[in-house]
Amino acid sequence: MKLQLIAVGTRMPDWVTTGFQEYQRRFPRDMALELVEIPAGKRGKNADIARILHKEGEQMLAAIPKSNHIVSLDLPGKTWTTPDLATQLGKWQLDGRDVSLLIGGPEGLAPACKQAASQSWCLSALTLPHPLVRVVVAESLYRAWSVNNNHPYHRE
């Protein structure tokens, strides 16, 4: 199974890249974590945010293989505890499809991305910077995998 994290933004600070790659490398070969970066639209003083979101959304959706299960990361989504996420991960594995998780840019996700998603996950009620979300999602997915595989990484 492949977990595909599709995120807006291409130039992240080194700590974001290092943090994401640390959890990415911990996954076993049968549960690969892949990052697909979508270039952020140019935002300026008089930028047309709706147009930027639309373009980012089109690029995100184009990066998703047709058979993938799509999960948006969005404030109105469901909050999952670690055991909840482990259960979701187990269900996704049983479903037999790869999973694409969508992380929007500064203004969030395009409406088309939200509509395409069959699940929506609220990572936190707090507003988090989208670069940090990459690392938190990677760690959370690894922790969920460790729960499902009785790996000592997660402790109750």
From Swiss-Prot:
S-adenosyl-L-methionine binds at residues 73, 104, 123-128. The lineage of its organism: Bacteria, Pseudomonadati, Pseudomonadota, Gammaproteobacteria, Alteromonadales. Belongs to the RNA methyltransferase RlmH family. Keywords: Cytoplasm, Methyltransferase, rRNA processing, S-adenosyl-L-methionine, Transferase. It catalyses: pseudouridine(1915) in 23S rRNA + S-adenosyl-L-methionine = N(3)-methylpseudouridine(1915) in 23S rRNA + S-adenosyl-L-homocysteine + H(+). It is found in: Cytoplasm. Its EC number is 2.1.1.177. It comes from Shewanella sediminis (strain HAW-EB3). Specifically methylates the pseudouridine at position 1915 (m3Psi1915) in 23S rRNA. NCBIfam families: PRK00103.1-1, PRK00103.1-4, tRNA_RlmH_YbeA. GO terms for molecular function: rRNA (pseudouridine-N3-)-methyltransferase activity. Homodimer. GO terms for cellular component: cytoplasm. This is Ribosomal RNA large subunit methyltransferase H. It is an enzyme of class 2 (transferase).
